[in-house]
Amino acid sequence: MVTDEARLASICCSTRGVEYRKIYMFEIKDACLTIGRRTIVRHFSFCAPDGQISVVQGAPRSGKTLLLAAMLGFVPLAEGWVTINGEVLNPSTACFFRAQMAYVPQTFSVPMPTTVAQVLDIVSTGWRKYEGRTTIADVQQSWPALALDPQLWQVNFNALTPDVRKRILLSFAVCARHRVLVVDEPTEGQTPEMAAAMMRLIKAEADKGTAVLLTTTSDEVAAEADNTIVLRGAVE
């Protein structure tokens, strides 16, 4: 069950007597998401406006990650639609739109021994860049704030603990210079100090005009949001 189903779904404005619908950078409208015969989310509407932090909050197994997968075009909606900058996301456009987003998944590993530097090379290859290829020097600017050691570049990514992997991926994402930043459970498994550091970095991206979309179980993360919607229920 979703509370506040229509929160920030659509805003109408009037200028010189002409009404128009404000275009948000990231919007999901009247969405229904099902697994088999079970409805996980019903008539869900939400927006992630430019320059703001928007949060989908819920308990573990409430469907947050599944909903995020649908919003990114990985999982089809039973009803409703997702738009990016006013354009509808569908199977033929999903890859194009995802390439314009910086996405940090809840968990991530690579299928073979790969250094952190090689992971950056793999990830950045898929980014649609406006200012050239992202380099180690670009990414490393945020590493002191995230307590990341420069020697990690030559370490096997899969050998690192999940909390360190998440901070590394966030450092990659903020260098992508995309208009949308999506992070699934940004502070999960982090110390309070590191969680606060990550949220400062994320807030700095919103302050630059990026549309930020987060999922979380944390009240502390939700407290940092400009817009929050809560999922209730469970995915079995």
Predicted regions and their residues:
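Hydrophobic anchor residue at the start of the ABC signature
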Residues: L169-L170
